[in-house]
Amino acid sequence: MFTPTYNRAYILKQCYESLVRQTCKDFVWLIIDDGSNDDTKELVKQWIKNDDGFKIRYHYKENGGMHTGHNAAYELIDTELNVCIDSDDFMPDNAIELITEFWKKNGSDKYSGIIALDIYKNGKVIGCKLPDKKSTTLSGFYDNGGKGDKKLIYRTEVINSYPKYPEFEGERFVPLDYKYLLADQDYELLILNEAVCVVEYMEDGSSMNMFRQYYKNPRGFSFMRKIHMEYDKKLINKFKSCIHYVSGSLIMKNKKFLIESPKKFMTLLAYPFGVILYLIVIRKNRQGAA
């Protein structure tokens, strides 16, 4: 398992303590420090000394955003499976055991990995449970009415067979579903209808600041919108991606956006709606800066 973190020393201990409590210690915790200037490094050094029955690896890098943390992690991971546990989240005491035992019984090269449940601290499932069948793609789950964040456990060999997340100068965010959507074209995920992660959405987390992310990272979002235009199965989802693509293109003043779009006619139809979204994003960011 790996955890990208940036200035989260104040909350990272919660994740560490949940790993100490694991009923199965057959895992490595890889911490990707994305340029923290708090005492994260010192904390981790102490945890390594504690020798709690599992290996801790620490890797420091210059700040680049969550997707660059994933790029760094995928280069370093050498286990068969990998799962990202965010710095403000933690695992139920039996999570590693659930994952490893389930994979031993059901895993094979046919699947890209496992999709499992995220829950809130009160035990409530985020969104909805997974369908009562053996496997699904991530995009197929959402296309068929699935809701809420889910925990994705991927085969390292599979996730590394797809291109890295692109890194755009001056930007700090590219949606993580880039690799997941590519994997969906070739594999399905085994369904594990059990909770393996307890989620807490922090005020300083990326999920809490989406309009600001749109404004600050238009190249990253526009890149991902083009990927969705190509691979999304539903027409309405392709059209929504065109709207967001137009908005992002206006933010970064890309005059060639129509030429560069993989769905030119649909992008043209989406233009008025994209302008409206662009104005909303601008207004929200001005309000946030006030």
Describe the function of each predicted region.
Residues 61-77:
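Glycine-rich, basic loop-to-helix element that forms the pyrophosphate-binding segment
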Residues 82:
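Short aromatic/hydrophobic "clamp" motif used to bind/position activated sugar donors
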Residues 94-128:
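Conserved donor NDP-sugar-binding/catalytic core segment of glycosyltransferases
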Residues 7-21:
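Short, well-formed alpha-helical segments that are part of the catalytic scaffolds
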Residues 18, 33-43:
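A conserved acidic beta->alpha catalytic loop
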Residues 26-35, 57-62, 86-87:
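Short beta-strand/loop segment that forms part of the nucleotide-sugar
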Residues 120, 124-208:
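Conserved nucleotide-sugar donor-binding catalytic segment
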Residues 209-235:
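Catalytic core of nucleotide-sugar-dependent glycosyltransferases
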